[in-house]
């Protein structure tokens, strides 16, 4: 039992000590979002030691921006490499079937996805639920929400 605890303590010491010093920062895969913006939001700094847990924090911060569909970080020869796949930008949101301008305005204001912002797939289902709730509260009990997403060539929807 004592040996088990010693092994665990040694494991934690070894994993916490292993940190890499970043001399260079390389960003790959970005088109719309600048390297500087990614470095700023990830709070990545040169000449700083980064452990795996600190790299995970950087990943979390970058995902929280909703700018990226996928982010990965690797460490190669004192260079931190951040690979990103950007979320598309919402070009236009069209509501059809609702004639009441007040309800349309309410629908536009309440949804999470907005024009000229990043398109996040997980927010589509949430917005559908929000729309259904608003329509039911306004007497449209049998309304059907159909989402259609058209991808364009310039990484917009």
Language-model regions: role of each:
Residues 2-10, 18:
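Sec-dependent signal peptide recognition
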Residues 20-157:
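Interaction-mediating elements
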């Amino acid at each position: 039992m004592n040996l088990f605890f010693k092994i665990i303590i040694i494991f934690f010491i070894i994993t916490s000590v292993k940190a890499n010093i970043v001399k260079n920062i390389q960003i790959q895969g970005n088109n719309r979002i600048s390297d500087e913006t990614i470095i700023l939001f990830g709070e990545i700094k040169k000449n700083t030691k980064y452990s795996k847990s600190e790299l995970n924090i950087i990943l979390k911060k970058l995902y929280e921006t909703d700018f990226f569909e996928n982010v990965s970080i690797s460490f190669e020869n004192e260079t931190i490499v951040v690979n990103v796949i950007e979320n598309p930008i919402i070009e236009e949101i069209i509501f059809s079937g609702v004639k009441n301008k007040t309800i349309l305005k309410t629908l536009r204001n309440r949804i999470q996805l907005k024009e000229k912002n990043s398109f996040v797939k997980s927010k589509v289902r949430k917005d559908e639920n929000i729309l259904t709730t608003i329509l039911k509260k306004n007497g449209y009990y049998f309304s059907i929400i159909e989402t259609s997403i058209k991808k364009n060539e310039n990484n917009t929807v």
